[in-house]
Regions:
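PLP-dependent aminotransferase-like
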Residues: 1-45
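Hydrophobic beta-strand scaffold residues
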Residues: 15, 80-82, 191
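Active-site phosphate-binding strand-loop segment of PLP-dependent enzymes
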Residues: 26-84
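Active-site C-terminal subdomain of aminotransferase-like
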Residues: 46-55, 60, 97-197
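Active-site-proximal loop/turn and secondary-structure-junction residues that shape catalytic pockets
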Residues: 55, 86-88, 116, 239
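Active-site pre-lysine segment of PLP-dependent enzymes
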Residues: 63-71, 75, 86-109
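Conserved C-terminal alpha-helix-loop-beta "cap" of PLP-dependent enzymes
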Residues: 178-253
Length: 255
């Protein structure tokens, strides 16, 4: 919610944060306390669990993890929505053991990310429960999410799902991230998390950051401690081996 300037809550829905570990995943046991804490009728009643695959920390839900989470959601009367902005990266990761059809049956709704894997704009929402589609178009229209030339988005996804292009591009991004991670470790950098997808997180000394600023752009992810910061690099389908190797050559050695 922090990166979306309160967009979810602006629609009238309340976000109930769940504290997760370093892998960025929500587990079944994390849900029960939230539900129990909100049984008071004066508090917001939980209705849906929102997760991302790949997660914000670049990790991937396994088939067993997603199955267990979905089962718990059903037991608690909660819907499960999966943010698939990086779904291509997740499903082509070496850490993944799910096919797209298997994944699709382990949640109530999800979207197939396009913006982060080749399209100029847009995502493709998949709703698995027919009762959730009632009035959905009107809802989109009311929120200003119906495009005049929406067919253009369909054309882009048609191209992405021809000849496995969507997954080829995501797989390439993952491979370039792995190359970058290996190169950073060889230069003495410390990884904050071993990400199997196209996000790379490194913990760097704050006094070294000016040297990094001089050679590339990156994102400050979070403070690590008083003298270190976690920074993020992201690769994509356009990232080449030459791009990665050139960046590694320019970055400081931290041995």
């Amino acid at each position: 919610n922090g990166h979306e300037v309160g967009a979810f809550e602006a629609t009238g829905h309340k976000i109930l944060p769940v504290a997760v570990g370093g892998d960025g995943k929500i587990t079944p046991d994390m849900l029960n306390p939230v539900v129990e804490q909100h049984r008071d009728p004066h508090l917001t009643k939980p209705g849906l669990v929102y997760i991302s695959n790949a997660t914000e920390n670049g990790t991937v839900y396994t088939k067993a993890e997603l199955t267990a989470l979905y089962q718990r959601c059903q037991e608690l009367g909660l819907l499960l929505f999966v943010d698939g902005a990086r779904l291509g990266a997740a499903l082509t990761s070496d850490a993944n053991d799910l096919t797209l059809p298997e994944f699709a049956h382990l949640c109530d709704a999800f979207y197939i990310g396009g913006t982060k894997n080749g399209t100029m704009f847009g995502e493709a929402l998949v709703i698995n429960r027919p009762e959730l589609t009632d009035g959905f178009f009107r809802m989109k229209k009311r929120m200003g999410a119906v495009m005049e030339k929406g067919w253009i988005q369909g054309v882009m996804f048609q191209a992405l799902f021809t000849d496995d292009l969507y997954f080829q591009m995501a797989r390439h991004a993952n491979e370039m991230a792995a190359r970058l991670q290996d190169g950073l470790k060889a230069k003495g950098w410390t990884l904050w998390v071993e990400s199997p997808t196209n996000q790379v997180f490194a913990t760097v000394p704050n006094d070294v950051k000016p040297q990094i600023d001089a050679v590339c752009d990156y994102e400050d992810w979070c403070p690590y401690d008083e003298s270190h910061t976690v920074i993020r690099f992201v690769t994509c389908f356009q990232t080449s081996q030459e791009d990665v190797d050139g960046l590694l050559a320019a970055l400081p050695d931290l041995h």
